[in-house]
């Protein structure tokens, strides 16, 4: 069975609108994939700063970080779930990505260019946006970032499933937008 890794950066437990989209998609994907979920909560990973860079330069990267990066590099598919926060996504996701961006594990370079080392063929990004921003809007910065990361790591095609304008909608409109995103996501999951 192929391997799928889910990076869940949804910060609200019971009330996460993003997770309301994610969960039915994972049920569908579980029919074809062995799924490992990495749930970020802000306490797991330290920002990559001077100390971490000095440790890496000295050849020290914590074994758990290396093991996690190797699992991500070996995954056939990747799903990232995160709400739209402050024109991006929760900082914990960026910190996690920086920790997983390990030379000779997720990417390498030859002095003139880089090469992604991940075997992933597709990345599915699941999100909810309070604002009325569609994927591709100049203010929606996450999809372009994930496409750039995909080039660096070798993650393949980036597909975004989003429900928008949720902060300015009635409860019934929110439900309808989330239901539409779930339907779109389930259609994508058939071929993902």
Over which residues does each language-model region extend?
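N-terminal beta1-alpha1-beta2 submodule of the flavodoxin-like/Rossmannoid cofactor-binding fold
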Residues: 1-102, 183-192
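Short, glycine-/small-residue-rich phosphate/pyrophosphate-handling segment
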Residues: 109-153
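Glycine-rich phosphate/pyrophosphate-binding loop and the adjoining helix
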Residues: 135-136, 140-192
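Structured loop/turn residues at beta-strand edges in well-structured enzyme cores
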Residues: 73, 91, 118, 153-156
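Hydrophobic residues at beta-strand termini and immediately following loops
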Residues: 38, 126, 161
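A short, flexible beta-alpha/helix-coil linker loop
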Residues: 10-12, 129-133, 165-169
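Conserved nucleotide-sugar donor-interacting segment of glycosyltransferase catalytic cores
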Residues: 100-112
């Amino acid at each position: 069975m192929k391997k799928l890794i889910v990076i869940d950066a949804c910060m609200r437990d019971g009330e996460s609108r993003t997770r309301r989209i994610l969960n039915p998609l994972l049920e569908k994907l579980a029919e074809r994939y062995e799924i490992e979920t990495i749930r970020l909560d802000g306490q797991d990973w330290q920002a990559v700063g001077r100390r971490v860079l000095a440790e890496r330069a000295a050849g020290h990267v914590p074994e758990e970080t290396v093991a996690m990066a190797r699992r991500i590099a070996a995954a056939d598919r990747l799903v990232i779930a995160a709400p739209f926060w402050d024109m991006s996504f929760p900082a914990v996701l960026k910190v996690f990505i920086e920790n997983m961006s390990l030379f000779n594990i997720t990417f390498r370079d030859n002095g003139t260019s880089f090469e992604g080392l991940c075997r992933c063929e597709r990345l599915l990004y699941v999100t909810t946006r309070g604002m009325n921003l569609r994927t591709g809007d100049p203010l929606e910065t996450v999809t372009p970032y994930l496409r750039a990361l995909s080039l660096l790591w070798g993650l393949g095609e980036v597909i975004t499933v989003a429900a928008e304008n949720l902060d300015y909608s009635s409860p019934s409109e929110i439900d309808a937008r989330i239901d539409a995103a779930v339907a779109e996501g389930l259609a994508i999951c058939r071929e993902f």
